Amino acid sequence: MSRFFTTGSDSESESSLSGEELVTKPVGGNYGKQPLLLSEDEEDTKRVVRSAKDKRFEELTNLIRTIRNAMKIRDVTKCLEEFELLGKAYGKAKSIVDKEGVPRFYIRILADLEDYLNELWEDKEGKKKMNKNNAKALSTLRQKIRKYNRDFESHITSYKQNPEQSADEDAEKNEEDSEGSSDEDEDEDGVSAATFLKKKSEAPSGESRKFLKKMDDEDEDSEDSEDDEDWDTGSTSSDSDSEEEEGKQTALASRFLKKAPTTDEDKKAAEKKREDKAKKKHDRKSKRLDEEEEEDNEGGEWERVRGGVPLVKEKPKMFAKGTEITHAVVIKKLNEILQARGKKGTDRAAQIELLQLLVQIAAENNLGEGVIVKIKFNIIASLYDYNPNLATYMKPEMWGKCLDCINELMDILFANPNIFVGENILEESENLHNADQPLRVRGCILTLVERMDEEFTKIMQNTDPHSQEYVEHLKDEAQVCAIIERVQRYLEEKGTTEEVCRIYLLRILHTYYKFDYKAHQRQLTPPEGSSKSEQDQAENEGEDSAVLMERLCKYIYAKDRTDRIRTCAILCHIYHHALHSRWYQARDLMLMSHLQDNIQHADPPVQILYNRTMVQLGICAFRQGLTKDAHNALLDIQSSGRAKELLGQGLLLRSLQERNQEQEKVERRRQVPFHLHINLELLECVYLVSAMLLEIPYMAAHESDARRRMISKQFHHQLRVGERQPLLGPPESMREHVVAASKAMKMGDWKTCHSFIINEKMNGKVWDLFPEADKVRTMLVRKIQEESLRTYLFTYSSVYDSISMETLSDMFELDLPTVHSIISKMIINEELMASLDQPTQTVVMHRTEPTAQQNLALQLAEKLGSLVENNERVFDHKQGTYGGYFRDQKDGYRKNEGYMRRGGYRQQQSQTAY
Amino acid sequence: MASRKEGTGSTATSSSSTAGAAGKGKGKGGSGDSAVKQVQIDGLVVLKIIKHYQEEGQGTEVVQGVLLGLVVEDRLEITNCFPFPQHTEDDADFDEVQYQMEMMRSLRHVNIDHLHVGWYQSTYYGSFVTRALLDSQFSYQHAIEESVVLIYDPIKTAQGSLSLKAYRLTPKLMEVCKEKDFSPEALKKANITFEYMFEEVPIVIKNSHLINVLMWELEKKSAVADKHELLSLASSNHLGKNLQLLMDRVDEMSQDIVKYNTYMRNTSKQQQQKHQQENMQRQSRGEPPLPEEDLSKLFKPPQPPARMDSLLIAGQINTYCQNIKEFTAQNLGKLFMAQALQEYNN
């Protein structure tokens, strides 16, 4: 029966393909009608197929079956559940039962269940073994069934007296039931089959489908094949399937219950099976069609075309033959397609193809660029929509298509300067074909490009960075950049300042992390020939990225009104400066921006960018030999121990438990693609080496000072780890190298230190990663020499009365002026108690270092000071008065504290020296 | 022959080790109500203690032993002693009481005084004011009222003067310990400070006349060089060690005070808060505010830190300070002497 309706609707939908009808017909017009009819129809089939009695009884038998199964596997909990359902179902079937009498099988299950439960109940051993739930269920079920069975006592006793008979009866009854139902089924099937056949013959003859006639066979084929597909995937028709299955089950159940089928019945059953199958197939088909129908009604008729896509490709069948393709028609069509967008069950891939088809048609019919632009916008939007999930990324082919499409769009836009594109153009005010006026199209090229950029990031995030695939994807980066550049050029002409800012930022984001090798090369080779040739060269090679960054960022600084873009631009600018070793510019910009004060209010991606910038800044400072600055810049990132996370270069396993799935997804989305990564080992090495250069002399200078503070906790941690090693082999990892170097430096042995810091292994791991590796290495050697000299002087000054600077300069392979300047500096800073003897070029030590006892006494005094302070605090508390007398005294005490400092001590000592 | 010698002592005179009894009892040390006013130690005991340390004690490790003797009038005579075996990890189940009883029984068989009158302990730079010492001395004194603890300082002895001191707990401290309440209030009530924890009992070393004669003779024969260790001017090591130890104790003291401070703050804060909260609640219910007493029942105040430890630390610091004072005074004396000598020679 359903066949009939399907056919009808089928032909109708087919007819709507003709287009003319559709144009005149309001889209929403037939929206609710047919599905409504259909649903009624569906219900009808069920109601007609089985009588109410059958239906109820089938329900009951089904439940009984599950109960029996549960009984078999001793799942009492399940039994209980099902029993409750059974009771309900029985209640529903009450009216029928009243008419027909209590069904035998019902009595039987009740009796059996009770017996079964009693048996279980008696089986103490088994009960013990049962799990808690089951045991509980058992007792409740037992009580329930006792209560319930009281109503059926007479039936049950009679059943128990004569179980055989009642079983037979039951079987008979079932047979009858199933016969009846199968008969009905048959009837119905007969009809449906007939209708189906009829439809087959009828459909092509429908006048609206004339144009499909030739393709009929093909069409059918495709439909069939699709049927198979549906069988496999079942995604679209899963609902119908499950329903179907239920029906099947009931039918089967009734059949299974047959005890002794006669041959006749056997045949019938076989026949029925076949029919069933056929019916099912038809049903499914009809279901699918129905669905399509629904979708058609929802979003234009195009879904129907899906079946004929290959066909359509060969011959555009978007519009009926002979239809005059006008703007109105095309736009109408477009709207229809777009309405399906975002709806469930819309085949997005097909939608895209359809749109592309539409472009083709529009192009073929010379509908003007406006329409094409419009459609293109929508194609790109659909491409973006293709993935329903935000986390998943575009497939490569989609991505390729998207890039092509944007390129084409840009081509058109460049070729036709009279097209205005904008977000703020309303649909109504669009002008797609009136050639007299400038064309106006709604849509924002900038948003598209931004989205494209996001998609690109997503693709990069989701590709294994060590695979060839990543490289392949990375090649698209050039294309992305090219597009951004084009859009930039376009927007520079037409866009508002805000838009320009946004596209500039995009450009910046694709520029800032790249090291400009060309510019670097140019810098390295000083102008040889005339300035003119150099200029030519520069022109040939295009703009320096530095100049480009400068230009873009300045524009943003000046014009941007949203804080975020400016912040990002500044950070990128700093990063770029730092990357190209323009330390002072980078630092000044960082300080001027005051970003350090308020970056914690920014959103996480900006914070990640900030962290990246700081790290780059630190590395830059290191390259310049500014160890202290490098250390300070890297301190925040390194001391947390979460550099990886802070730089957005990976998630920490440790905190994995702390966050839920949602957060993790969010964090994953924040990750920086691999090609932007900053080498973490390099980062750590730079940090540790700069910490070493600072810390080792400091440690040597304050060896006996109780108030000595650590400059770098992390460095100390590494040192301690190194010390804990029971057996010290030659260093393997970068950290071990640094630790070994630190130890050498502590002894003032700069040569060993040097060999630990700069060797083959470390070169490969770290130093070669710098663009100017050799320069860095020379800087590093010099730093090591200087700091070793300082350490040496701190550590061993007490054993020297005087030392010749020449000796020192030989020892550390530094030239005399450098040694002189280092020592002078130390003397000025009161780090070294010595004086320089100019004529002999020697350092004369002053024996003013406190002895061990003096040091101890100083420490003791300090400790006592704090003790007194603590004591006073207790006293304050007792008194309940903060401030007052003791407060004053405390301040006084603090004033005196100065004498404990080394400088003060020395002064005192020099006064009392004899 | 028991000579008393003050710490600031002219070192040159009391050179003989046996003669150098280290009874530096301060005036307040002897308490009037105790039966024992003086401790008389046999030379044998002193030698045994020294020998015990030399054979078994090393560095910071301490040696301990039992003192035997008897009380005669107001005098505690220590006539013999025996050492405790050193504790090692292996014999954790070693029964000390059993060992003591057996030792004493055996000694009785050879007619040696077997009255348990206390115990002795070696010390490392005078760091003996500890909880362990307090506890065991308390149990001794609890059982035998007269018992004392002899503290032997091997390092000082090595510098030329025997250092042996007898201590016992003051009656006040005994009472506090009996009650086992070391809360700040209890200590305040007992009016106990670190100065009145231990009292030193003056000691006298007694030898038989024959031995005394021998001593004189030995002294005559001994070369001058044997006595020179007393004149050593090297002071830094000892002083440094003492300072280090003192510093550690000061650190502990600081921590203790901080702990106490936090406790005080917490208590007052809690009291205020809880009081306010409770009263607010009561007010909202229209009840009169709670009286103070109920409050402490309602809310358990934070556990007050035991103050005994800080008392002990204070006592220890005091000892160190005494030590350092003594030592520096002696050394200054030596320095001046050396200077004078040099001037004289020149």
Swiss-Prot record, chain A:
Residues 8-21 have a biased composition (Low complexity). It comes from the Eukaryota. Residues 199-216, 261-278, 887-900 have a biased composition (Basic and acidic residues). InterPro entries: EIF3C, EIF3C_N_dom, PCI_dom, WH-like_DNA-bd_sf, WH_DNA-bd_sf. Phosphorylated. Phosphorylation is enhanced upon serum stimulation. SUPFAM superfamilies: Winged helix' DNA-binding domain. GO terms for cellular component: eukaryotic 43S preinitiation complex; eukaryotic 48S preinitiation complex; eukaryotic translation initiation factor 3 complex. Residues 1-44, 157-302, 523-543, 886-914 are annotated as: Disordered. Component of the eukaryotic translation initiation factor 3 (eIF-3) complex, which is required for several steps in the initiation of protein synthesis. The eIF-3 complex associates with the 40S ribosome and facilitates the recruitment of eIF-1, eIF-1A, eIF-2:GTP:methionyl-tRNAi and eIF-5 to form the 43S pre-initiation complex (43S PIC). The eIF-3 complex stimulates mRNA recruitment to the 43S PIC and scanning of the mRNA for AUG recognition. Component of the eukaryotic translation initiation factor 3 (eIF-3) complex, which is composed of 13 subunits: EIF3A, EIF3B, EIF3C, EIF3D, EIF3E, EIF3F, EIF3G, EIF3H, EIF3I, EIF3J, EIF3K, EIF3L and EIF3M. The eIF-3 complex appears to include 3 stable modules: module A is composed of EIF3A, EIF3B, EIF3G and EIF3I; module B is composed of EIF3F, EIF3H, and EIF3M; and module C is composed of EIF3C, EIF3D, EIF3E, EIF3K and EIF3L. EIF3C of module C binds EIF3B of module A and EIF3H of module B, thereby linking the three modules. EIF3J is a labile subunit that binds to the eIF-3 complex via EIF3B. This is Eukaryotic translation initiation factor 3 subunit C-like protein. It comes from Homo sapiens (Human). The gene is EIF3CL.
